[in-house]
Amino acid sequence: MPKVTLQEIIGKVEQLPQLPQVALRVSRMMEESATNAEKLSDVIRLDPSFTSQVLRLCNSAAYGFSRRISTVKEAVAILGHSTLKSMVYTIIAKVALDRPVPGYSLSEGDLWYNALTCAVYAKHIGHRERLPDPEVAFTGGLLRDIGKIVLGDFVGANYAEIEALTTKERIDFLDAEERVIGFNHSIVGTRVAEKWNLPPVLVNVIRHHHKPVKLPPTLPPAEAKMISIVHLADALTSMVGKGAGNDGLMYCLDADALMRVGINIQGDYLERLIGELVDLNPIIKDLAESMSIAGDN
C-alpha cells in the first residue's frame, strides 16, 4: 500500500471538529504577560458551558479545595495562572479526544481517559522530581497523543503490517508507523498543535515524548526534564492506567534519557512510584466524572 501523503494528513487535520472558542481564547490570553485575572474572568463568563466546566473542575476532589468555589472570579483568583491554564487545556482536550479511534482499538472515552491519566501521573512525577511548574507536565501528558485522532484511520488500514514490523525488526510502534505509513502520530500531532496555535513547549512534548533521546541539545534543562517526565508517565500509564490502545506496550522506556535529566529509575524507584500512581486512580476517576457531568450541561 502506498504511503500517506502530506496533503492527506493536512486534509484530516482540517476536518477536525471546532474546539470551544472561548477556551482557546482564554488559553491564548494566558500566554500573554499583560493578561490579568479580571480580563480572564470576563472572557470565561462569555460561555456558560465553559464556565460550568471550570467551576465543576474546581470543586472536584482532584483540586481538593476546602470550600466550595461558586464564581468564576473566585476560581481565577484561587487557582492561579498555571493551574487555570492546565484546567483550560483539560476542557479543550476532552472535546478533541473524547471520541472512538478504532485504528488504535480505542473505544469512545478511551483516548480521553488515557490522556487524563497520563496528565495526572506526569504532574505527580513533576512534583516528585521538583519541576519548576508541574502543571506544564500535566498539560503535556494530556495532549501528547493528539496525533492519533488524525492518524487513526491510516493505522487501522495498515495495522497488521505495522505490528509485524515491530516483531520482525524489533522496533517500536512509532518507528513502524513511520516506516509503513510515512508519518507517525507524534509528527502528525505537531501539525495539530500548530493548527491550534499551542505554545512551543507543548509542541515539543508532542513531538518528543516517545523519544526524549532526540531532544534538541539547545532545549532549556527544565523543559528537557519535563518532556522526559511525560515520557516516563506515558510508559507507566500503559502499564497501570486505562485506555491504552493496541500500541500501548509497544514502546521502550528510555532509562538513559531519563538519567541525563537527573532521573535515576534504578533500584526500587519504579516500584515505589507505581504504588503512588495507583493511589491516584480514584482521583482520576473523579476528575473524569466531573468533566462528563459538566459536558452534559
Q: What do the predicted segments below correspond to?
A:
Residues M1-E8, A255-N297:
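Terminal helices and disordered tails flanking the catalytic cores of nucleotide-processing hydrolases
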Residues M1-L253, M291-D296:
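Conserved alpha-helical "signature site"
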